[in-house]
């Protein structure tokens, strides 16, 4: 009998580590993107809110950009080394800075520290400033990450092509306007099912960069490779009808950091005296008028519970074209890992 070879057709699927978790205790939702590099998790309204000429739209949302992690046990075995066991996966790595609070029987446990070692998804250690007198800490104990890199937390009215939102990158808060009206010079040839885009009289090495988002015939594509001025590769593969002479537009996020907000920097020194604490739940507000040249405003409820707008984007007499492709926008929350994050950030939101 001749030797026979058999094979079974197999496939490998990536499994996302992100999650949406309903919070039945307060009606909120917890979102995590997981630890996978370059992963994104999004929660968006099914409906796009239709902009009507002559009217503005206001959006409000309750959000915590850097929520706490609940500590289950906190102990010290007669030394300054403290062992933390969390109720849920802590998501932090060795060397991360965090602030622990809520210990009532020995304040030596409380404070800002650096993670010394990570045992597993639920246990890590840190070195306190001294040796706690109490072996086991008591109280409603929790911790916040002090900073991170490689991930952004967002909330506002936006999609992949247009919109506005707050963005927290682990260190700074930003007001962001997203627009996809910038046309790239030259034209492109696109083929259905192919990720290769060929240009005609294009200058893609100077007008695009790897990681940029583009819009081709209404669909968003991410630039993953720039071969030369006339050839780029995008993901996902082009989904539309094969064509030539196609205009490519670039998605641009215009970011203004908190210390440059033009009404109040929300650090306690501005006109409203409001000091933004990203570790606390916030009522965030946005409103906008479009007409192609309207204005976008960003705000919060201040220390007196009053809505105060802290930054705005003006467009009339400044831009040369409309600041959105469309004024129709959804409400949206999102966490994006732009590399390998130093922690697994999450956000809490309520309402929408």
Predicted feature residues:
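Low-complexity, Ser/Thr/Pro/Gly-rich disordered linker/stalk regions
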Residues: 1-69, 144-181, 253-259, 315-352
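Extracellular/lumenal carbohydrate-interaction signature centered on repeated Trp-anchored short motifs
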Residues: 48-58, 90, 273-280
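Extended, low-complexity, turn-rich repeat/linker tracts enriched in Gly/Pro/Ser/Thr and Asp/Glu
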Residues: 65-69, 106-108, 290-294
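Small/polar beta-strand repeat architecture
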Residues: 70-96, 101-144, 182-252
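Solvent-exposed serine/threonine-rich low-complexity stretches and specific carbohydrate-binding patches
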Residues: 113-115, 311-318
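Amphipathic alpha-helical scaffolding segments
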Residues: 156, 296-312
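Short, aromatic/His-centered strand-loop micro-motif at the edge of beta-sheets
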Residues: 253-283
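Localized edge beta-strand/strand-to-loop motifs within extracellular or lumenal beta-rich domains
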Residues: 279-295, 301-303
């Amino acid at each position: 009998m001749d030797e026979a070879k058999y094979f079974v057709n197999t496939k490998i699927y990536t499994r996302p580590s992100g999650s949406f978790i309903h919070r039945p205790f307060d009606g909120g939702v917890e979102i995590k993107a997981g630890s996978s590099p370059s992963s994104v998790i999004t929660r968006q309204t099914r409906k796009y809110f239709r902009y009507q000429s002559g009217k503005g739209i206001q959006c409000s949302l309750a959000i915590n950009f850097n929520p706490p992690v609940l500590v289950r046990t906190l102990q010290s075995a007669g030394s300054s080394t403290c062992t933390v066991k969390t109720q849920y996966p802590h998501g932090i790595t060795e060397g991360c800075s965090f602030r622990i609070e809520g210990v009532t029987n020995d304040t030596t446990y409380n404070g800002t520290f650096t993670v010394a070692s990570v045992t597993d998804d639920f246990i890590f250690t840190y070195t306190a400033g001294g040796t706690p007198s109490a072996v086991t800490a008591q109280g409603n104990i929790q911790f916040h990450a002090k900073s991170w890199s490689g991930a952004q937390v967002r909330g506002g009215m936006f999609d992949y092509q247009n919109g506005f939102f707050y963005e927290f990158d682990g260190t700074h808060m930003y007001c962001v306007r997203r627009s996809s009206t910038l046309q790239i010079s030259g034209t492109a040839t696109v083929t259905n099912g192919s990720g290769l885009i060929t240009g005609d009289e294009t200058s893609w090495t100077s007008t695009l960069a790897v990681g940029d988002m583009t819009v081709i015939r209404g669909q968003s594509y991410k630039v993953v490779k720039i071969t030369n001025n006339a050839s780029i590769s995008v993901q996902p593969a082009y989904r539309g009808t094969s064509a030539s002479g196609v205009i490519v537009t670039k998605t641009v996020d215009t970011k203004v950091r908190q210390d440059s907000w033009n009404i109040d920097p929300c650090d306690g020194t501005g006109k409203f005296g409001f000091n933004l604490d990203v570790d606390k739940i916030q009522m965030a507000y946005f409103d906008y008028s479009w007409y192609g040249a309207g204005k976008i405003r960003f705000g919060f409820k201040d220390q007196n519970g009053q809505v105060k707008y802290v930054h705005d984007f003006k467009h009339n007499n400044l831009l040369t074209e409309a600041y959105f492709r469309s004024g129709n926008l959804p409400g949206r929350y999102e966490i994006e890992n732009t590399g390998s994050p130093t922690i697994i950030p999450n956000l809490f939101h309520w309402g929408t």
